[in-house]
From Swiss-Prot:
The keyword NADP applies. It comes from Aspergillus oryzae (strain ATCC 42149 / RIB 40) (Yellow koji mold). Its cofactor is heme; FAD; FMN. SUPFAM superfamilies: Cytochrome P450, Ferredoxin reductase-like, C-terminal NADP-linked domain, Flavoproteins, Riboflavin synthase domain-like. Keywords: Electron transport, FAD, Flavoprotein, FMN, Heme, Iron, Metal-binding, Monooxygenase, Multifunctional enzyme, NADP, Oxidoreductase, Transport. This is Bifunctional cytochrome P450/NADPH--P450 reductase. In the N-terminal section; belongs to the cytochrome P450 family.
Amino acid sequence: MSTPKAEPVPIPGPRGVPLMGNILDIESEIPLRSLEMMADTYGPIYRLTTFGFSRCMISSHELAAEVFDEERFTKKIMAGLSELRHGIHDGLFTAHMGEENWEIAHRVLMPAFGPLNIQNMFDEMHDIATQLVMKWARQGPKQKIMVTDDFTRLTLDTIALCAMGTRFNSFYSEEMHPFVDAMVGMLKTAGDRSRRPGLVNNLPTTENNKYWEDIDYLRNLCKELVDTRKKNPTDKKDLLNALINGRDPKTGKGMSYDSIIDNMITFLIAGHETTSGSLSFAFYNMLKNPQAYQKAQEEVDRVIGRRRITVEDLQKLPYITAVMRETLRLTPTAPAIAVGPHPTKNHEDPVTLGNGKYVLGKDEPCALLLGKIQRDPKVYGPDAEEFKPERMLDEHFNKLPKHAWKPFGNGMRACIGRPFAWQEALLVIAMLLQNFNFQMDDPSYNIQLKQTLTIKPNHFYMRAALREGLDAVHLGSALSASSSEHADHAAGHGKAGAAKKGADLKPMHVYYGSNTGTCEAFARRLADDATSYGYSAEVESLDSAKDSIPKNGPVVFITASYEGQPPDNAAHFFEWLSALKGDKPLDGVNYAVFGCGHHDWQTTFYRIPKEVNRLVGENGANRLCEIGLADTANADIVTDFDTWGETSFWPAVAAKFGSNTQGSQKSSTFRVEVSSGHRATTLGLQLQEGLVVENTLLTQAGVPAKRTIRFKLPTDTQYKCGDYLAILPVNPSTVVRKVMSRFDLPWDAVLRIEKASPSSSKHISIPMDTQVSAYDLFATYVELSQPASKRDLAVLADAAAVDPETQAELQAIASDPARFAEISQKRISVLDLLLQYPSINLAIGDFVAMLPPMRVRQYSISSSPLVDPTECSITFSVLKAPSLAALTKEDEYLGVASTYLSELRSGERVQLSVRPSHTGFKPPTELSTPMIMACAGSGLAPFRGFVMDRAEKIRGRRSSGSMPEQPAKAILYAGCRTQGKDDIHADELAEWEKIGAVEVRRAYSRPSDGSKGTHVQDLMMEDKKELIDLFESGARIYVCGTPGVGNAVRDSIKSMFLERREEIRRIAKEKGEPVSDDDEETAFEKFLDDMKTKERYTTDIFA
């Protein structure tokens, strides 16, 4: 019985402008991003029109499965591919259906890509891959690797050698082969030309002239290769011989000279461009997901070990195969396919999709957004956006519905070079994981795209360190060894220990795991101290210690715990450490651990440092001293760290290795020359520049100020709802002026900072050996408001020797726990103490040395990329309060970052970067999932983004008829003081409420009518029946705010849970069913842990 036809509905889409249509809705640099955003807004199908030409964009598996039916639809050459026909005419990828040259070439070339021929290319693939391995081995672990560039060299040289017997020798030149520049130029310009009217493309512009020059270069190069082969024939069964000598088994015809050139260019481009992108994405995914990286490397170790890889090994790497499948699912490097109604087989009039729901125009093509189709949650589940290779192992991959994975195209027009690309990718990944440990150059890097007609990561750098037992000198011969020689070599050549940095200094290694810079600052602080104890300390990220923890001196691990997870630059180390096996593999290591955490994350408080401390010890290492811990919720973490170092770590090092203290002499840390009349700014950052578009005050007088800032993001930067924006701030000018005044510096003073001696601190985060404006130094490089530590007090006391009364006072504060606690509680900084005690005679060099480096601050993004992916907003409170350390009543305590942000104006530039949320703190993919959001004050920020995202989806999908009348309920509980004064974003939320995106329930703690105030937890308890019903129907709960808000909401949820639990227990007892014996606290904690695991209860708590 056939399904009744659906009622046709209009195909939705953005409104265009006259003549140009939707051309302005499509980004010029990364068109894919805007096309996918429109799919999120308008649903599984939408229509675009440019210059009178329309096409439908498809983003769901259900509709894609229809148009992949080759009885109804066939490949359509349009947009950028149509423009490429100027260069490669009717080659395999650009031919229209029915063109004779395509049919001949397809039948001639298919045998060249048969399994045996591909396997016979293995040795040549291995030869080029060896060149890549040796380049990275010789560069060493400090070298930043531009991943896409070197993978481009690899794949271009591989296709040239294997398919055409030609060596481009790309690894022997700093510059890319001219073929690459011409290819990129042609592909990019073809895409640009496809978005312009034909008249403009015929104008003699610089870009158009370069386009034709690139085409000429590519064709002439291939003509030269063909002519050389014809003059020097060979029996090699490669692609070039097939092109020249092959005959069509159906017609007996050979390929024409022009067709040979067309397809040579096609294969040189297709044979390397997409594979280099896929390899780059694969390594990005593995480095972002340490567990997957660990499994892939363990598979290589288990299957291949240290011997030379063989072609037979590639069939025994199911996990690496899954990594590649999952990579191509998330980021198909050829991101779209165009189809149109089959001109001879499809007799529908009109042509429809969705069982008659969507009516296509006559001969209207459809473009399939493969990335969206392959991330369809109806096929891949709610975690469809996440990288999980396990879903692509054979047992799961083979059960996928038809057409759910299409990165190589469809049917007759699918990529015939797939076996070649697959063998090459598996070989390269296996060889690299066999020989190197990798880490991102910037662990906070999130994927950015570069698009021509294909996509690649942009600005993606990593570092490669040879694995334990390998060195560059012997690796070349080991790679060509036939069997066990590689393994024998590895066993015989261990890594050399770190060299001593001076005749009397012993080696020491300090590893840090840090996202915000606190633990890195501690690591450098400890390394600075090491010289005076007789050690030369190397400071590296924790990931650098993976696979090779040194045994030639003390090793210190300093790491934070972020919501129970390791920092970005410690994730691979932690994964490796957790998987260590064998009998005491870390025997001979002498270590200590210092950890940071935040007490509001009770269930995961200090989890990572404690686990590192336990696991390193359990694997045979010697623990030098007890773990040191600092709660970042307290202001005085520096003193906690210094105390641990002075009372635990350094005495333990002396006991184990002997004392080699080089002094307690009170010499200045820096020599400083002061001059004026110059201003120099030097700032080395791993952030990018954003532009302030708008800075708006959201509150009225009488309440703490809250603002929202809209930023224009750096090119290629992407974000998702729930992500953070990291900002590098500048100290308030009033605070900087206090420094200038205290040290009697004129406003234009210039400092030149040098090390006082060669053994002075090596780990400096300020400009050295160059002139820098004193104002810039104190404004941008250092933290001026950090509470003073006990060590700071000791330095100040020594500098107050001329005033015994002040000296005694400072010593008393340091030694009295109650008085010292006030330093943290009142946020009294070194600068505050210098102002309070003017007789302290502190050298400016010592003052600079006491200041920690400026760190970034993270703010929840309060916008949705569906509105504009090139912009994002933050919403924040401005911290401005009476100073508890004030010398006068007029003094105020100013939040460093919030003050800086509040003073920004439109057009000003800011150093920033997007940081992903490490939890499930993101809105549901589907509008059918209910939401409960609770916040107070600026905790509203991420929820504004969530609701904005829902509103855009609702508007788009309603216009397409692809969603029910009402989406699932989304309730927002928002705490504020007084209606009309600080109920921020009220107008926007009211508009979104009208379309059903949210229900806003405000709790006013200080109502204007003088009535009793309420808080979000009070409103939630009033609505408990509704909330329990929502939760039992699948709702997700989100909480954002201070610890007070988080704890209060948690208590409300606990109360509701226990009430509902008691009701369920009563009913069960009445039915004679068993009930749990857990006490109430245990039952609630189990429930909460389960909800967190399922990402149905997530929090974002800030100080």
